[in-house]
């Protein structure tokens, strides 16, 4: 049994909690804090000296030691973290609200990787006293739940940071058609700047957060593209919208000051409002009146430059240069791609992390946040992007990925090469590595079999065997994945469905066109019922995955989506049977020519595309309408 000296009681308790993840052999480890290198481990013959600079780094050091002792007796390792703060932010606003048990599990793994900070992105998913519609039926965290999560992070000397919204991205709240909510609204999902009741709401946000020990918060304010152009415009006329942003920011910062918080905010709106074409990555000319405001506010807020797309260091460097025109207090947010359907893209996350890390180091950035967004339903599993998180940890502490697989296996029990096979539903053989967002996992699954509006973005002769092989690979990995087996079981079933579904709509049309009623009958009576059965199995597996990781709220959306898909397959069966029985002289849906869904990659030599909004994949009809 391992014997430690130099641990305080809290550290000893934390190590007990981590025993389920890592184990050390019968050795002696002398632990001490040092103001020099981040992590230093030296020794042999069962006796080791371990030092750490910041308390949270102890747990990575022990993981690194466990890895090293698995390879040999003599250990001599030094690591120097490039970033003072390395954070992971879990999105809890796109229906999937991480449950408390899973938040604790995530904190444990992050501690072993060397993260300093755990963040939760909560648009309306925390409770505010006196605001019953805020988080209504959305699984909003109580103050007690947030306190429990924070206390667990503190057990590992990690900081907990809430990420909220104080301007836009509040659609789940402002949709409610009651006066007390609508009077807070400017347009779309944006709050009405200047309305005093808005600042009462924001005060309530901070009142809830003040029950935590942390005094660091991200106040959001990103993607408020139409700010000042709805009710604000009617009430106040045309104004300089960059100045309007500054005025609102100052009011929010004043409220934050009242509760003792230091704020971060996403930086994009300043650039979008001051650039000539409304884009984030542009040079900007700052109007003088806005410059006066920014000079006054810049020391009160940290700007977070977020970028999940660039495949070269130079592109990040250019955007850092633009940010420094506004402020020197800049943090960086990269992405662990879990927002394009059921399947993540750790491979692309690795590519962009390597380049972003180079630029962050070159620009002396001291804080990096890895974001795990969950766009359009939070369907990707929370723990599916663990490889991306380990990649950023390795880049921070080592500036290379030489030990990535060994460290990852210590922390998860699975090699990173095996774990990253979870991406397979997105990794079609003909796709280049440097394109983001291409997501056949989602649009092949959700598209209709009678009205397959994305059919031309599939290459069945390539895709069908790819998905079938992926299902087999993932099933094999499931057997050795331990606590993470559920992830691979779900993905294996998804890939099996994709293999069945990728050509069925096309074959229905081809058989109908040539009058092949034998094939139509075989599809309607055998293939489509089998496909429904496969989807029902997937729904059960997905539901288990969801309930393991998240609160139940939000699962209703997936029930509706998959239930609709099943009913549409039944409709296809009945339409084909009616045609075969002579009850219909034609199937109208099969006579409509399929047009391009988009032209994003029209000049490329592959078929796949990006389609990430369920309501546009599932039907050409209107779901959102008046």
What are these regions (language model features)?
Residues 2, 16-52:
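Short, well-ordered secondary-structure micro-motifs within conserved domains or adaptor modules
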Residues 5, 44-264, 331-334, 339, ...:
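Feature activates predominantly on carbohydrate-active enzymes
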Residues 8-11, 33-36, 56, 66, ...:
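Residues that cap or initiate secondary-structure elements
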Residues 1-25, 70, 108, 148-151, ...:
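Substrate-binding groove of N-acetylhexosamine-processing glycoside hydrolases
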Residues 35, 44-46, 84, 297-299, ...:
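Residue-level preference for short coil/turn positions at secondary-structure junctions
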Residues 9-13, 33-39, 50-60, 500-503:
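Short, surface-exposed beta-strand/loop "edge" segments at domain boundaries and coil↔beta transitions
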């Amino acid at each position: 049994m391992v014997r430690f000296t130099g641990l305080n009681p809290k550290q000893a308790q934390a190590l007990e909690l981590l025993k389920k993840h890592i184990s050390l052999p019968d050795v002696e480890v002398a632990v001490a804090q040092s103001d020099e290198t981040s992590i230093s481990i030296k020794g042999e013959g069962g006796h080791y000296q371990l030092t750490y600079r910041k308390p949270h780094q102890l747990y990575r050091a022990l993981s690194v030691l466990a890895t090293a002792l698995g390879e040999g007796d003599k250990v001599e390792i030094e690591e120097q973290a490039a970033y003072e703060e390395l954070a992971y932010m879990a999105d809890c606003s796109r229906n999937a609200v991480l449950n408390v048990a899973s938040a604790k599990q995530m904190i444990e793994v992050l501690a072993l990787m060397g993260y300093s900070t755990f963040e939760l992105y909560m648009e309306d998913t925390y409770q505010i006293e006196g605001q019953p519609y805020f988080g209504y039926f959305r699984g909003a965290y109580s103050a007690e739940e947030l306190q429990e999560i924070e206390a667990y992070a503190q057990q590992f000397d990690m900081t907990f940071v809430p990420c909220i919204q104080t301007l836009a991205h509040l659609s789940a709240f402002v949709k409610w058609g009651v006066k007390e909510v609508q009077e807070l609204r400017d347009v779309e999902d944006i709050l009405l700047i200047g309305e005093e009741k808005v600042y009462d709401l924001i005060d309530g946000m901070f009142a809830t957060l003040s029950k935590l020990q942390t005094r660091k918060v991200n106040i959001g304010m990103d993607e408020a593209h139409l700010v000042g152009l709805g009710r604000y415009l009617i009430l106040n006329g045309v104004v300089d919208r960059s100045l309007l942003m500054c005025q609102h920011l100052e009011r929010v910062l004043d409220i934050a000051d009242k509760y003792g918080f230091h704020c971060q905010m996403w930086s994009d709106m300043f650039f979008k409002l001051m650039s000539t074409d409304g884009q984030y990555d542009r040079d900007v000319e700052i109007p003088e009146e806005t410059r006066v405001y920014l000079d006054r506010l810049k020391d009160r807020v940290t700007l977070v430059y977020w970028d999940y797309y660039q495949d070269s260091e130079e592109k990040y460097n250019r955007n850092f240069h633009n940010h420094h025109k506004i402020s020197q207090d800049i943090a960086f947010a990269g992405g662990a791609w879990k927002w394009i359907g059921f399947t993540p893209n750790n491979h692309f996350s690795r590519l962009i992390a390597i380049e972003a890390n180079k630029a962050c180091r070159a620009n002396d950035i001291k804080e990096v946040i890895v974001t795990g967004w969950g766009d359009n339903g939070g369907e990707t599993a929370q723990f599916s992007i663990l490889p991306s998180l380990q990649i950023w940890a390795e880049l921070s502490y080592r500036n290379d990925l030489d030990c990535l697989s060994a460290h990852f296996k210590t922390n998860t029990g699975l090699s990173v090469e095996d774990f990253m096979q979870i991406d397979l539903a997105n990794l079609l053989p003909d796709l280049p590595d440097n394109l983001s967002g291409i997501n056949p996992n989602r649009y092949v699954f959700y598209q209709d079999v009678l009205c397959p509006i994305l059919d031309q973005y599939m290459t069945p002769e390539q895709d069908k065997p790819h998905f079938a092989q992926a299902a087999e690979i993932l099933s094999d990995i499931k057997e050795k994945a331990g606590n993470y087996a559920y992830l691979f079981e779900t993905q294996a079933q998804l890939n099996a469905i994709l293999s069945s579904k990728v050509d069925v709509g096309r074959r229905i049309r081809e058989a109908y066109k040539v009058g092949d009623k034998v094939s139509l009958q075989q599809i309607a009576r055998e293939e489509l019922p089998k496909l429904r059965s496969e989807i029902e199995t997937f729904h059960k597996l997905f539901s288990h995955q969801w309930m393991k990781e998240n609160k139940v709220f939000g699962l209703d959306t997936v029930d509706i989506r998959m239930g609709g898909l099943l009913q549409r397959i039944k409709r296809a069966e009945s339409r084909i049977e009616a045609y075969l029985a002579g009850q219909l002289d034609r199937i109208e849906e099969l006579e409509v020519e399929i047009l391009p869904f988009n032209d994003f990659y029209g000049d490329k030599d592959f078929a796949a595309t990006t389609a990430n909004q369920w309501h546009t994949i599932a039907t050409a009809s209107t779901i959102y309408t008046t």
